[in-house]
């Protein structure tokens, strides 16, 4: 949808066709033209930056809110293993080394009414935590940080944000850059 915007500093009057394309993608692509460490963004399964001359770091994060509201354990597990998979599939393959998460739930001690089709926030909390723990830590990828927020506004739908960090060599022994994937017929 088009958004009418007036810049408070310059007074410039403009229309924004897409907040994501205008305020996330465009500045990132503009920066990519100016720096040599931003290797791949908005293209493959995760973003890739040059860590040093020998290694690249990639990261992917996404939400799994609706699936986790319907099935807290399964929804959260598919969220974390999905971003693990995306790291493995970045470029010619990266090694997942760490997971991260942010969870927002209704208060676990909620005593108010709940619609028939909603789970109690404490059930959602326990299920999401277990799903991410089993999908990440128990598959050998440690969760190195996270956050939990409890607020009434998340009673109807939790926020389940999962991310994975991976590493990959900048170049393979044959000289190919590992973040560049060029599939051909028959692969």
Task: Label each residue range with its predicted role.
Residues 1-187:
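Long, structured ligand/cofactor-binding scaffold of large enzymes
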């Amino acid at each position: 949808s088009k958004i009418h915007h007036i810049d408070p500093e310059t007074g410039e009057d403009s229309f924004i066709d897409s907040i994501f394309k205008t305020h996330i993608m465009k500045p990132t692509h503009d920066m990519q033209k100016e720096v040599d460490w931003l290797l791949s963004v908005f293209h493959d399964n995760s973003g890739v930056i040059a860590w040093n001359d020998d290694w690249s770091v990639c990261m992917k994060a996404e939400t799994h809110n609706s699936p986790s509201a319907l099935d807290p354990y399964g929804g959260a597990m598919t969220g974390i293993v999905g971003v693990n998979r995306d790291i493995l599939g970045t470029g010619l393959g990266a090694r997942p080394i760490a997971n991260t998460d942010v969870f927002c739930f209704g208060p676990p001690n909620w005593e108010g009414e709940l619609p028939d089709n909603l789970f109690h926030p404490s059930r959602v909390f326990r299920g999401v935590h277990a799903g991410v723990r089993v999908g990440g830590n128990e598959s050998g990828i440690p969760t190195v940080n996270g956050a939990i927020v409890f607020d009434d506004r998340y009673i109807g739908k939790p926020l389940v944000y999962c991310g994975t960090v991976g590493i990959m060599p900048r170049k393979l022994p044959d000289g190919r850059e590992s973040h560049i994937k060029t599939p051909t017929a028959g692969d």
